[in-house]
Design a protein with these regions (language model features):
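The DNA-contacting recognition helix of HTH DNA-binding domains
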Residues: 17-18, 28, 39, 57
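Short basic helix-loop element that most often maps to the first helix and adjoining turn
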Residues: 4-23
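Helix-turn-helix/homeodomain-like alpha-helical modules used for DNA recognition
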Residues: 67-131
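DNA major-groove recognition helix of helix-turn-helix/homeodomain DNA-binding modules
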Residues: 44-59
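Small-residue-rich helix-loop
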Residues: 144-175
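Recognition helix of helix-turn-helix/homeodomain-like DNA-binding domains
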Residues: 24-40, 62-65
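Charge-dense, extended regions
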Residues: 167-231
């Protein structure tokens, strides 16, 4: 989130700077400086602005390039984080504090093993938050050699969007796929299920979808089988 987005959100509500400053508990002068980029927006302020101005979770701050994976995700409750971002499969967990969906998606894709229900929610993140910071996401996915996993998630998201007749969303996702295509890795991987047996791996090499084969992933996940595909 930057000053331009802050100003756009204020104008969207037809508020003057004085009205917004009162709601955000800052002075009008300080709000003006933030909108002009002369003062930084703290995380605490951004979280308040999200609620007051009804901004999407994509406005939440992202970690620096160096710190994107600095904190271990092994204790992350990804089901709760998906629920907090509105994923219907975990709607009963929506009370959790939200994080930027690009950060949640990246950290989940970097996990060696995920609950299958969580893995199924990752294409939903890409589809629902199609306007997330893709430059940040793709850069960091490439740093950790996770671009194939990301490409597969985006491929399923595009497939589901097309099935829902969401042409503009599908178009955006296809444009991101083109970027990921240029960075596609030749080595075999799984879609966050590294603990599968050799027998399972052999079976999946023969029975995976064309999309999974294209991204060199061993998985039986298909867009048509996702619970939200027909919503």
């Amino acid at each position: 989130m930057d000053g331009n987005l802050l100003k756009e959100a204020r104008l969207e509500k037809h508020w003057t700077q004085e009205q917004a400053a009162l709601a955000l508990d800052v002075t009008q002068a300080y709000l003006s400086m933030m909108e002009k980029g002369h003062r930084p927006l703290s995380e605490r302020f951004v979280r308040k602005a999200l609620k007051v101005l009804n901004l999407p979770a994509t406005a939440l701050p992202l970690r620096s390039e160096e710190g994107a994976m600095a904190v271990s995700s092994h204790k992350r409750d990804f089901s709760a984080e998906l629920g907090a971002l509105g994923y219907p499969g975990f709607s009963y967990l929506r009370s959790r504090r939200r994080r930027n969906p690009a950060e949640v998606l990246l950290e989940a894709l970097n996990e060696p093993n995920l609950d299958a229900r969580v893995a199924e929610g990752l294409p939903w993140l890409a589809m629902t938050y199609v306007d997330m910071d893709w430059d940040w996401l793709v850069r960091n996915a490439k740093v950790h050699d996770r671009q194939n996993r990301l490409g597969f998630a985006v491929s399923l998201a595009s497939e589901v969007s097309e099935g829902r007749k969401q042409s503009e969303r599908a178009r955006k996702l296809r444009s991101y796929l083109e970027v990921l295509e240029r960075a596609r890795l030749a080595r075999e991987d799984t879609f966050c299920h590294d603990s599968m047996t050799q027998a399972e791996r052999a079976w999946l090499r023969e029975h995976r979808s064309p999309a999974a084969a294209h991204w060199n992933l061993l998985t039986d996940m298909k867009g048509e089988h996702l619970a939200y595909a027909s919503e």
